[in-house]
């Protein structure tokens, strides 16, 4: 980087470190002059874990370790990154977006980028796989859009995540149990069968009538 900005960067990192809580040394979601640091949240911690790599890899790694330990979760067969610490709860807002099972969409997408730059390839693939499943991607004229293209900033973030450089692979401890995806697929199959039953697709008599003229 440009050496002219090194004193500025070093000063910012030092000031940020001074404001970390001793009991949970993660960067807070908000910081206002003269006030105590705000709550730590998954979306902002994921972003800091990704962006700090550009200025201080050691600090970035410490933040990513906290993200991985306290915010990556597995609920009802669905992996993701919680917006709030596992022992707390809160609602969604403009930063986190709507929460699903406590997960924040931005936290999951940006968390995948953080996982990539820290060499946590398996977790990055799992989180990106979740975006493929939930985002319902559609390809049209050589372009891929998620959620029907209704949230273009989401498309941009996913593209940014996929283009984040993969760090040197490390033997990260697995966070999810073996066969972690089985409950989700079973649940999806039950929902699909229920919808098929409600729609009459499982009734051979009703299916045969659909093909007959009135």
Model-derived segments and spans:
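CBM-like carbohydrate-recognition segments
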Residues: 60-211
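Extended ligand-binding clefts on enzyme/binding-domain cores
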Residues: 1-106
